[in-house]
Amino acid sequence: MGIPDLSSGTQTFSSDSEKAECLNNYFCSVFTKEDQNFLPLPKTAHPRMSNITVTCHGVLKLLEGINGKKSSGPDEISPRILKEVRVEIAPILTFIFNQSLQQGCLPTDWLTANVFALHKKGSKTSPENYRPISLTSVCCKILEHIIYSAVSRFLEDNNIITPRQHGFRSGYSCETQLILAINDWSHSFDLGHRTDVAIFDFSKAFDKVPHKRLLAKLAYYGIAGNAFNWIGAFLHNRTQRVVLNGSKSAWSSVDSGVPQGTVLGPLLFLVYVNDIVSDIKSEIRLFADDCILYREIKSTVDSQILQDDINSLFSWSKLWQMEFNVSKCHIMSLSRSKKHVNAIYKLGNAALSAVHSFTYLGVEITCDLRWNNHVATVVKKASNTLNFVRRNLYRCNGHVKELSYISLVRPLLEYATAAWDPYTSCNIKDIEMVQRRAARYVKRDYQRTTSVTSLLDSLHWQSLQDRRRNARLLHFFKALHGYQGLSQLVNDLPRPTRLTRSSCVDVVAFSQLPCRTDVFKFSFLPRTVIDWNSLDTGVRGLSSLESFRQALVGGRSAATSY
């Protein structure tokens, strides 16, 4: 489906060329006009990054990994062609890449982008509801990968990126961020304390990053030498045009932002927002531009501290020219008591609106930390998708039907389930019902006398409840073995005794956590500790993630007959 007629003010745009021009004008209108009276950052105390040298072997490896089906950029150099002639072209690209790094300049074609408009949500007739995705030169992206690898390794090795940031980082994910936040909230809930959560929404965050301020932060964090010079050239003199069904808008200059769709864009954004956590006394959690701030409220002093932290975020946004969308910023109180008086918090001069639920990283959080609403939403979405698949693939064989369920329906039921794994029988039953309907569809058996359990067994499908348990245990295993996202969460667990092996981490059971409420009892940590303790010592002692995964599955990989 294409983009319908667009409306901007009193004007309506119908033809593809008009719509492309309208979208491009809107995308350019949100760029930041940077304040040149910039207060420099203090002299850096971070080590300086060394120069990058590109090797032919590294370029060849990246060329081998190219997805030949991806689109080319404005230079129209096909990724499929690059992959096919990789052996011949790798030495040439290596020379060009090293020259580009040494001279700190890029070919003009590398600074252009064909922009495609991706609908987010809301009315499709409004340009404001589209996100610009840049298609750039594939050759440039290969060099971006090399620079990304070097810069991200430097930042991680020197512990520069805050551990509160879980976006675009190896070992971190939406799920790890959700697990940590919900663990904090449910534990406070268990103790009878109220937690006030402030939810912030940046307006066009990736498009508004001012370039000079970004370069100043890169220098402050130690990004130096040819990488720094190259990134500066990468951001300077960029142009873009919107492409829609073959129609193209006029070229426009890109005055701010990190281009969405590039390799370096997400990493540059992480660097830019990294110091937002400075001087914050409450708990702050980031996933790229998603930001929440929360604190246990035991007295008015805590409310004032949270307000001071909100003020700090507002001051940061003004200094670094990043705007909050105040109408989408909210406050929510998590509490066992229904009689507490909500405090009033302000972002600048605007009071934050109080809500009883909000969606964080794709999961609906309610003020009582129950999962009824989220389960209902997930089940409805998965059921609608299953119905769509059934209507369109009813003539296909069982193998195709099974693949359609596994790839299109089940992921909707299992997104981030380690964080919100439901425990009430009604929620568990509602989720399992979708899979039971899918089993009948795959097996083409709708007879009332047929046991659905036998159909599930013949398909070798684990129950979704068991799969959620395994997902939690896998996260727990990763945390024990030093994967970044959750390592601190399990490091603080009490261990009654200590049994060690030379080749792996501890295999001892952990002490169970005291719980007063079901909300905390069935949250990730207390629940998974019990599940971990129930595993055989031999399974707990495995050092390989894949071996541990296979042990949990328990040999359910047999072929299915249809």
Regions found by a protein language model. Give the residues of each.
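Active-site palm subdomain of RNA-directed nucleic acid polymerases
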Residues: 147-165, 190, 266-295, 396
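Short, conserved micro-motifs composed of acidic
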Residues: 49, 246, 308, 323-357
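Surface-exposed loop/turn segments and immediately adjacent short secondary-structure elements
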Residues: 1-129, 134, 142, 248, ...
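Basic, alpha-helical interaction scaffolds
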Residues: 281, 350-419
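Conserved pre-catalytic core of RNA-dependent polymerases
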Residues: 20, 27, 45, 49-259, ...
